[in-house]
Amino acid sequence: MTDKLNDLFSRNREWAAEMERTRPGFFTGLANQQKPQYMWIGCSDSRVPANEIIGLAPGEIFVHRNVANVVVHSDLNALSTIQFAVERLKVRHIMVVGHYGCSGVQAALEGARIGLADNWLRHIQDVRDRHRDILDVIPEHGKAAALCELNAIEQVVNVAQSTVLQDAWAAGQDVTLHGWVYGCLLYTSPSPRD
């Protein structure tokens, strides 16, 4: 194995030892059951780590990530994850979290061709086209940030319209949706736009 991979294992051992030192029995409890109250639907971007951003430990948040935090009704991966979170784990809050500086959103805004992912980014281009009247009056330097916000809102709507959430709400289950956009340059927690 390469030194870089060995370094990952070393870091994991250090992290696990620190967790056990500061929270004795943490891993025993974690091995038995997860009971998160939160689900995070976010971007795959390595700069946007769900647990670290909101200060939650493993087991406290259920996470689904993809390029540009997209939720579409044909994505069985996302829908299955949402269903598991809502029906099995009984999460109380689902946060759809976009982030400023999202490369996927930028590529969709520009209409850039990047390969297979173009098919995925088409969903964000649909958001762009649906809100063209808003984006057209925004200065060029602010369009990507605005599209990040619009995309987060549209994905919240998609989650809300899913059969999973519709059935949960019809059954009286208490699940709240939130749309957030995280700013890496702000060094702060997400600003809620519920």
Model regions and ranges:
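Conserved small/polar residues in nucleotide/adenosyl-binding loops
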Residues: 187-194
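Divalent metal-coordination and catalytic microenvironments
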Residues: 12, 40, 96, 179, ...
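Short, conserved "active-site rim" segments that organize catalytic pockets and cofactor/ligand binding
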Residues: 1-72, 76
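Short HxH-centered metal-ligating active-site micro-motif
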Residues: 3, 52, 57-144, 154
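Polyanion-binding loop/helix "lid" in catalytic or ligand-binding cores
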Residues: 125-181
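A generic local structural motif
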Residues: 24-28, 80-83, 163-164
